[in-house]
Swiss-Prot record:
Names of required cofactors: Zn(2+)
Protein name, as recorded: Methylthioribulose-1-phosphate dehydratase
Cross-referenced HAMAP family: Salvage_MtnB (MF_01677)
Catalysed reactions, as listed in the record: 5-(methylsulfanyl)-D-ribulose 1-phosphate = 5-methylsulfanyl-2,3-dioxopentyl phosphate + H2O
Highest classification ranks of the organism: Bacteria, Pseudomonadati, Pseudomonadota, Gammaproteobacteria, Pseudomonadales
Gene name in the database record: mtnB
Function according to Swiss-Prot or TrEMBL: Catalyzes the dehydration of methylthioribulose-1-phosphate (MTRu-1-P) into 2,3-diketo-5-methylthiopentyl-1-phosphate (DK-MTP-1-P).
Pathway named in the protein's UniProt entry: Amino-acid biosynthesis; L-methionine biosynthesis via salvage pathway; L-methionine from S-methyl-5-thio-alpha-D-ribose 1-phosphate: step 2/6
EC annotation from Swiss-Prot or TrEMBL: 4.2.1.109
Keyword Transcription regulation: no
Keyword Amino-acid biosynthesis part of the UniProt annotation: yes
MF annotations from Gene Ontology: methylthioribulose 1-phosphate dehydratase activity; zinc ion binding
Lineage: superkingdom: Bacteria
GO annotations of cellular component type: cytoplasm
Amino acid sequence: MSPTRAQLTRQIIEAGRFLYGRGWSPATSSNYSARLSPGEALLTVSGKHKGQLGEDDVLATDMAGNSLEPGKKPSAETLLHTQLYTWKTEIGAVLHTHSVNATVLSRLILSDSLVFADYELQKAFAGIGTHECQICVPIFDNDQDIARLASRVRPWLDEHPDCVGYLIRGHGLYTWGAAMNDALRQVEAFEFLFDCELKMRALQGR
C-alpha cells in the first residue's frame, strides 16, 4: 500500500529535522521531495528553514515542476527533483543537502567527477553488494538557470543508470532512494565518504 500524503509529508518534515541536526542542511538551504503519485511529487516550499518545517511547508507539483497549490511556491530547483522521478519510476524520494563537506569537496576537485573505490561503506548504496567496485559521482558546475542545469544532468543519468547521486559544484549533493529511509541512508553514506576523502587529501598534502 502506497504512503498517504500525510505520511509522506511527515517523512519530509522528519528528514529535515534529521538533516538539519547533522549540519547537512543549514538554515533555509536544501530541498526534499517524495513521489506522491505517478504524475505528482511533494516538495518543500521555497525559503523555509529545514529544521523547522511544518505541514504547510510542503506542496504538490506536477512532473514539469509546476505548483498544484495556488499561493505556494516550490523550490527553484524543483526540476532537478522531478527529472529524477521521470528518469526512474522506482525512485520514491529525493534529497538535496548543503553540507560543508559536499560544498568544499566539490570546489576542491577540478575534474568533472569524484570516484570512490574500495570503501566498505559503498555497500550502503542501492545496488552495491561489494567494496570491490568504483562509484563515480559526477560534479556539475552550478547554474542559476535550473532548466539549463537539468538539461546537463539528464544525459549523464541516462548514460549511467547505476548512478546513486551527484554533486553541484560549491552547492551540494543530490541523492535518492525507493523510499525516504533509503535516500537518508545514502546521504549518510555519502557524508561519511566525503569526510574520508577530505581527510585522506589533507594527510596526503593534496
